């Protein structure tokens, strides 16, 4: 995706850019910014999911909720393997079902959306060292040459861009609240629906850093329009106290909301904006808002990616792929187990697209 700029005013998109596989021209108005019979096994999974949901809803402490959102499995039992096998039947591997995905994508304009942590890079203890491999970077580079591509992350936009190290992509940081295209101007942003919250976010960041100093292993990350309190390196016995500390701080800021991810507490502005809204915004800004032959593909591993999966299901258009090694309640249609499988899928998708494009050129009749 080269030579692409999209300029957005407060009320709408002023201009759209020509992209690989995408239309050129202005987009529409701005959006308001995944050992019994199969049936018995499915019933078991449904009941298990309901039990997890009920348990989360009735948590009497933050530690309970934090455990529910960040399950830890040092090893898999036979029942775990059976459960995962049944889950994969419902959310099959995007690799084993690649031909099916290719058939659904044939003749469509593919637009790629990917989370960063846990999708393009492994989950690590220190979020500042979540580097992607050179092989993954090369794969993403090929994807961006072939399809319009965006990285949608909870991270600060500039930080995730530095991790990825590629310029020809769209970057949506802070869970989609800070979107920028491949422009030469580092200050030009496409969309920042939570700009008014910046002073408040900075204030809360300083308070949380001070309050969590007493908790060994806790790390507060400023993602510009949202904050992350990582507890992956915190002793589980301290989770409840840490959760209460964070909760007490956020209680003083009714315009902010507290949510949970994979061993992380997220503080975000209470506005109607998430990764799903970011996906819709990017599709519109690229000129695909009302395009019947577009195929958005979203790959992510976190609970916040579910907002994007829901949008794709609601549209009845596109593919959601959850990256996970354990069963999760998800709106994604397909699954991949880890970043290694993500990279394999990306390379196969690029290879398929290039072969199919070459084939269509070969059989094109002369005029």
From Swiss-Prot:
Q: Name one GO molecular function term.
A: trehalose-phosphatase activity
| UniProt EC number | 3.1.3.12
GO biological processes: trehalose biosynthetic process
| Pathway annotation from the record | Glycan biosynthesis; trehalose biosynthesis
Q: Does the keyword GTP-binding apply?
A: no
Reactions catalysed, as given in the entry: alpha,alpha-trehalose 6-phosphate + H2O = alpha,alpha-trehalose + phosphate
Cofactor(s) this protein cannot do without: a divalent metal cation
What keyword terms does UniProt attach to this protein? Hydrolase, Stress response
User: Got any disulfides in this one, which pairs?
Assistant: none
Q: Which family, according to the similarity comment?
A: Belongs to the trehalose phosphatase family.
- Matching NCBIfam families: HAD-SF-IIB, T6PP
Q: What is this protein called?
A: Probable trehalose-phosphate phosphatase 4
């Amino acid at each position: 995706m080269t030579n692409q700029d999209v300029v957005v005013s407060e009320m709408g998109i002023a201009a759209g850019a020509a992209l690989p596989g995408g239309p050129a021209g202005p987009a529409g108005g701005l959006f308001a910014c995944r050992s019994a019979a199969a049936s018995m096994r499915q019933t078991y999974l449904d009941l298990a999911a309901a039990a997890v949901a009920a348990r989360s809803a009735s948590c009497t402490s933050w530690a309970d909720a934090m455990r529910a959102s960040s399950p830890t499995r040092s090893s898999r039992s036979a029942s775990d393997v059976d459960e995962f096998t049944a889950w994969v039947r419902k959310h099959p591997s995007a690799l084993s079902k690649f031909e099916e995905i290719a058939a659904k994508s044939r003749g469509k304009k593919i637009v790629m959306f990917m989370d960063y942590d846990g999708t393009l890079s492994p989950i690590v203890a220190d979020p500042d060292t979540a580097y992607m491999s050179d092989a993954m970077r090369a794969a993403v580079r090929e994807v961006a040459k072939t399809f319009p591509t965006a990285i949608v992350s909870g991270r600060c936009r500039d930080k995730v861009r530095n991790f990825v190290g590629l310029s020809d992509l769209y970057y949506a940081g802070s869970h989609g609240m800070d979107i920028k295209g491949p422009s030469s101007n580092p200050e030009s942003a496409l969309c920042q629906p939570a700009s008014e919250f910046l002073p408040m976010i900075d204030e809360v960041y300083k308070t949380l850093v001070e309050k969590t100093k007493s908790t060994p292993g806790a790390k507060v990350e400023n993602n510009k329009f949202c904050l992350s309190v990582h507890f992956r390196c915190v002793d589980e016995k301290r989770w409840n106290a840490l959760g209460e500390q964070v909760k007490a701080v956020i209680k003083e800021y009714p315009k902010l909301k507290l949510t949970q991810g994979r061993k992380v507490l997220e503080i975000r502005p209470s506005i109607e904006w998430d990764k799903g809204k970011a996906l819709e915004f990017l599709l519109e800004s690229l000129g695909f808002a009302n395009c019947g032959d577009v195929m958005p593909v979203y790959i992510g591993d976190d609970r916040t990616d579910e907002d994007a999966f829901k949008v794709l299901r609601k549209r009845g258009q596109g593919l959601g792929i959850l990256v996970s090694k354990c069963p999760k309640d998800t709106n994604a249609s397909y699954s991949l187990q880890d970043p290694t499988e993500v990279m394999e899928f990306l390379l196969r998708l690029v290879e398929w697209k290039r072969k199919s494009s070459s084939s269509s050129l070969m059989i094109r009749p002369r005029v």
